[in-house]
């Protein structure tokens, strides 16, 4: 569905359900791209699959940072990734209520965070953003955004103390645009909220496709250089794009095919390859549950949880339940 001049063309997808670790992801939750275009994916399955997987859009696999556990440098449920001006990596963990800092080589520097409801304390941190070496954290169960210095010293917070319109409910992904404003995926309120860097409300964007398909539990948000807003619309199982005036531009359900990693797997598993090649899928549409439809149709997004736009205007959408991200070119 296209309005105006913005359209996306499917390019490829990267990912593989990795149950035993190694190349691939397991229930990924977030992704971020470093300046060298290496892509970091938070994988949060069990055992050897937990950590930050490093890949490229060309199917290179560079290894993993972190392991499952509670010690400094380990993770349980990594939920968000961000980089500071020195390209240190920060990883939020919503199980441990902390943020861990790693250097460029992936060596742990420190970790900070205390569970609780007080100022500076965290309950399910789900989003990270770093601007001018100030760390913004979506503190989901406390329904607020908190700000810290990069060493974890608390600065301040903003949430529902100003106006009803600016109240957050389970904020999730957070990003910024060229305007240096903050864009928050306000998951529980089905909208995107825009603040300035000090937490002053600028605008509320919530219509999506309007009455036909309003936003439903948005998980993440990205902004391109033109100011267009990309939403991983988790509840509707789609990517929605609209402009800063809340005008709908484009929607995609996903178009994935078998990627290089999957094809290599089937080459090594000839029985599965033969069975798949002779199988003609019949998609039953006897349900209106969009998540169930996504589960049945392999090209579709299944729980889109993270979205980003790179410097070349490529759009990346990460899916939790299909353990992959789809890549689109803007045309």
Predicted segments with their positions:
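Eukaryotic scaffold repeat domains enriched in small/polar residues
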Residues: 1-331
């Amino acid at each position: 569905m296209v309005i105006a001049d913005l359209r996306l063309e499917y390019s490829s997808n990267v990912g593989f359900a990795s149950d035993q670790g190694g190349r691939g992801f397991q229930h990924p939750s977030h992704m971020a791209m470093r300046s060298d275009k290496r892509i970091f994916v938070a994988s949060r399955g069990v055992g050897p699959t937990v950590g930050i997987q490093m890949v490229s859009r060309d199917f290179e696999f560079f290894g993993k940072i972190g392991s499952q556990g509670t010690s400094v440098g380990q993770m349980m449920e990594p939920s968000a990734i961000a980089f500071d001006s020195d390209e240190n990596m920060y990883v939020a963990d919503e199980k441990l209520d902390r943020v861990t800092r790693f250097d460029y080589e992936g060596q742990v520097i420190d970790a900070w965070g205390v569970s609780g409801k007080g100022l500076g304390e965290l309950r399910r941190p789900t989003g990270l953003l770093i601007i001018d070496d100030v760390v913004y954290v979506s503190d989901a169960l406390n329904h607020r955004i908190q700000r810290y210095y990069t060493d974890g010293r608390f600065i301040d917070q903003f949430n529902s103390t100003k106006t009803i319109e600016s109240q957050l409910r389970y904020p999730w992904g957070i990003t910024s645009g060229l305007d240096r404003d903050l864009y928050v995926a306000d998951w529980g309120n089905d909208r995107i909220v825009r603040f300035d860097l000090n937490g002053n409300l600028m605008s509320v964007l919530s219509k999506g496709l309007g009455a036909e398909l309003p936003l439903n539990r948005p998980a993440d948000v990205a902004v391109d250089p033109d100011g267009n807003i990309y939403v991983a619309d988790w509840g509707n199982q789609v990517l929605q794009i609209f402009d800063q005036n809340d005008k709908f531009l484009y929607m995609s359900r996903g178009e994935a095919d078998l990627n290089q990693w999957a094809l290599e797997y089937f080459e090594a598993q000839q029985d599965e390859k033969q069975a798949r090649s002779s199988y003609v899928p019949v998609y039953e549409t006897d349900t209106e549950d969009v998540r169930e439809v996504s589960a049945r149709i392999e090209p579709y997004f299944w729980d889109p949880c993270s979205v980003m736009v790179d410097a070349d205007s490529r759009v990346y959408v990460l899916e939790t339940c299909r353990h992959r991200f789809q890549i689109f070119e803007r045309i």
